[in-house]
Amino acid sequence: MAGNEWINGYLEAILDSHTSSRGAGGGGGGGDPRSPTKAASPRGAHMNFNPSHYFVEEVVKGVDESDLHRTWIKVVATRNARERSTRLENMCWRIWHLARKKKQLELEGIQRISARRKEQEQVRREATEDLAEDLSEGEKGDTIGELAPVETTKKKFQRNFSDLTVWSDDNKEKKLYIVLISVHGLVRGENMELGRDSDTGGQVKYVVELARAMSMMPGVYRVDLFTRQVSSPDVDWSYGEPTEMLCAGSNDGEGMGESGGAYIVRIPCGPRDKYLKKEALWPYLQEFVDGALAHILNMSKALGEQVGNGRPVLPYVIHGHYADAGDVAALLSGALNVPMVLTGHSLGRNKLEQLLKQGRMSKEEIDSTYKIMRRIEGEELALDASELVITSTRQEIDEQWGLYDGFDVKLEKVLRARARRGVSCHGRYMPRMVVIPPGMDFSNVVVHEDIDGDGDVKDDIVGLEGASPKSMPPIWAEVMRFLTNPHKPMILALSRPDPKKNITTLVKAFGECRPLRELANLTLIMGNRDDIDDMSAGNASVLTTVLKLIDKYDLYGSVAFPKHHNQADVPEIYRLAAKMKGVFINPALVEPFGLTLIEAAAHGLPIVATKNGGPVDITNALNNGLLVDPHDQNAIADALLKLVADKNLWQECRRNGLRNIHLYSWPEHCRTYLTRVAGCRLRNPRWLKDTPADAGADEEEFLEDSMDAQDLSLRLSIDGEKSSLNTNDPLWFDPQDQVQKIMNNIKQSSALPPSMSSVAAEGTGSTMNKYPLLRRRRRLFVIAVDCYQDDGRASKKMLQVIQEVFRAVRSDSQMFKISGFTLSTAMPLSETLQLLQLGKIPATDFDALICGSGSEVYYPGTANCMDAEGKLRPDQDYLMHISHRWSHDGARQTIAKLMGAQDGSGDAVEQDVASSNAHCVAFLIKDPQKVKTVDEMRERLRMRGLRCHIMYCRNSTRLQVVPLLASRSQALRYLSVRWGVSVGNMYLITGEHGDTDLEEMLSGLHKTVIVRGVTEKGSEALVRSPGSYKRDDVVPSETPLAAYTTGELKADEIMRALKQVSKTSSGM
């Protein structure tokens, strides 16, 4: 216990406090606190049990030293001896209780992980057995061979990479559009405020540099980095700019258009005037999705005109960074039908386990603070949709992603083996994990080779107070003003003052090692601060502890800790440390990667780093430093002293780092990245070739516009009266201008071509159109009211809502003319049509019917959606769109097995064939008490490699499973992408309760009217299990995009709510 005298004093005070066994603190008696022999007594020797000794042993073994120190300070602050004795007695047992609680939590954590691994093994066996049914005996043996461990990482990498063609200049003719997403933090290209808060750190720097580097690769035309737009007065105005150009890209000067290069695109979501922490952004992510979708569609059209020969250039890949952006990327990828890539950066399950082990917060407190369960679900959803997951290290794959339901290393190998043989995986899928270390921009790195000699930087730093000192970077002077002898080698640490960065242990190691103190200085770059009191509690606590340790060890003149630095100063800080022949250290408890280690190596600095995480791979690749146990301050001090004192070792580590640093360059990273993405199954919407380019569509639109002109000209006043619903809407188009445009088109064409005369003749006597009227709608009213009876049949209230919505919209003739209607329901088409017939509502009054919980989309009144018998058939392009990773039989068999009774009392569900279709497996719920929640079902399906969308619907009487890309909310985005109806121009009419997918529909840029009193109950109770994320993590509690009806179910009340939501949303 050398160097921890205060602990000895604390324990002696406990033992000398003259407490006795009769009190709550029981256990008198003195004795040596360092002797554990009296810590416990055999059972039955109750009078010999000494709780003080037992407490001492428990404290020494299980309580964090810094916490104990703070407690001791509070104790000795009391002057009155009697009060001090009482407080000491109480705290004695309080800390002992906390120590026991911590051990209990550790045991629970071990049991939880053990149970999870056991379940994973069982699931893996079941999945392998299911998959092996259609394999021959030889193939089964090959599959088992796939599960055998590979001898070396290098061999595994070569095997996986051998089938791919490395990206090269041969791809220069390609004009790719790449989308990167990083939602949270403050993101800009210049003067990045890294360290300003916990959301603006290394990830911001990483994504900005990745965007720049990717745009310079051959074949890449444009890179968009999406982030949140922040127009708060608390931050710089630049974060409110919609677009910021990062660089011109590799196509600059080639005359290929004006949109090439790399850009930051800022998308508004949530409160426009507030900068929100990432934990508060979850309810607004769907707004971000809709805003990003609108930009991508506009940009795709513009790029098509520039480099795509008139055909839209959709993103080559959509890449989400962190859990929130992974959630966004999954939805965008599904809406656009393009591949998705994920980089986790920091993972929620790993953080949850670490926080639980610390024992300072319960799981409920952790979730309340960090929204950890919503973050984990975002990561699971991103795994569902990802083609590729990029990690920095092998450790991240094995020890972090392995904790997730959606990834299993062994099952992934089995599925990959089947895919190579062309054998069906029955809808099971695991994303491919690849290690691609982050890159670094070396363009501004200046390495002075003269450091290898005996020269020093005396000329650079001498005479700071002289009349004409040699010019030096300002940050050098800021650092050296702390130091008595600035000529000593510098030990440099650069990180936020976060507890997990372990800065306090570094200061202790430096303070307690006299040879190290005499030989070197310590420089701590701990973010930026103005006032410690204004910092977050965790960061302030770390910084305060550091200052106290500096005072305790009297390190004044040996430790520098400047308050401010900017991004441009960071290379100069590295350069100063290298000139001083110093060492860079990263002592973090766990480091996912360690980008600062790469930066330090590029400037010629040897490194000392934690042995937990990414630094292991970095030191193996660069061979330029030492690894240490971050909990062992003696090991940290020894490693630093070894590098600083041994000149030959220092020079060798420096040379090795500079020689191998090219492995972490951005061009190398991007080349590997594009090679891997090229190996993904690229997909694009099939309908891009079909509409609206064909002649039939042009002719039909011309005729429809002509009829519109005649009709509108009769109904519009000379003043161009506007609809009351759109008075304040910036997206409103003046009908008078629209008429003028149509009349101009008519005048420009003196006569119809012969081929159009027959179409005109048919059009005058028929309501059938070749293409849906959706493509001409300016407004779309989506009725998604889940009104069902106890047996799951639609109630009359659903009909009443439909009729009143029609009356409300028709009351404004201008609005009705430019508006369309869609009915969105969990019912199959047959029951939907029966309901409409019952209410005498023609199906053709709807532009689209979304049926089967989003598994099918129909267009009544559209010729292309009618079969030979005149019956409606679903949109075939939509069915192709959602078929990705879908197996009807695999989902049906697995759900039936999971819902089967374990006690022999009968199954909880039976298949509902009438409600099922090729992309929807429907089950009738027989016993609601036996069914599992959506959370539980999703977890079990993911563990088996099945990626589906699960929902309970129709008053909890049905369980419906549809493809991952299908849902009622995603069907609306499909309509937006397919037919050009802006999501911002959609009005969703729904009830207070509904199916379990209602939450997904309430968020987004569309306007929502919630009709009170029409749904008494829904299926929401089956959404989540206890301990899961909350509804407020999905749906914003307050938003200008939603309004409630207040009175009876009447058209006037619905119109009032529509006007209200239009007015409030227009002010956003």
From Swiss-Prot:
Region annotation Disordered: where it falls in the sequence:
18-47, 118-139
**UniProt cross-references to NCBIfam families, sorted A to Z:** sucrsPsyn_pln
| Top enzyme category | transferase
- Pathway where this protein functions: Glycan biosynthesis; sucrose biosynthesis; sucrose from D-fructose 6-phosphate and UDP-alpha-D-glucose: step 1/2
Documented activity regulation? Activity is regulated by phosphorylation and moderated by concentration of metabolites and light.
* Any one Gene Ontology BP term: sucrose biosynthetic process
Task: Recall the taxonomic lineage recorded for the source organism.
Answer: Eukaryota, Viridiplantae, Streptophyta, Embryophyta, Tracheophyta
Descriptive protein name: Sucrose-phosphate synthase
Summarizing the function annotation, the protein's role is: Plays a role in photosynthetic sucrose synthesis by catalyzing the rate-limiting step of sucrose biosynthesis from UDP-glucose and fructose- 6-phosphate. Involved in the regulation of carbon partitioning in the leaves of plants. May regulate the synthesis of sucrose and therefore play a major role as a limiting factor in the export of photoassimilates out of the leaf. Plays a role for sucrose availability that is essential for plant growth and fiber elongation.
| Example of a GO MF term | sucrose-phosphate synthase activity
Presence of keyword Glycosyltransferase: yes
Protein family (similarity comment): Belongs to the glycosyltransferase 1 family.
Gly residues bias (residue ranges): 23-32
Recorded catalytic reaction(s): these are: beta-D-fructose 6-phosphate + UDP-alpha-D-glucose = sucrose 6(F)-phosphate + UDP + H(+)
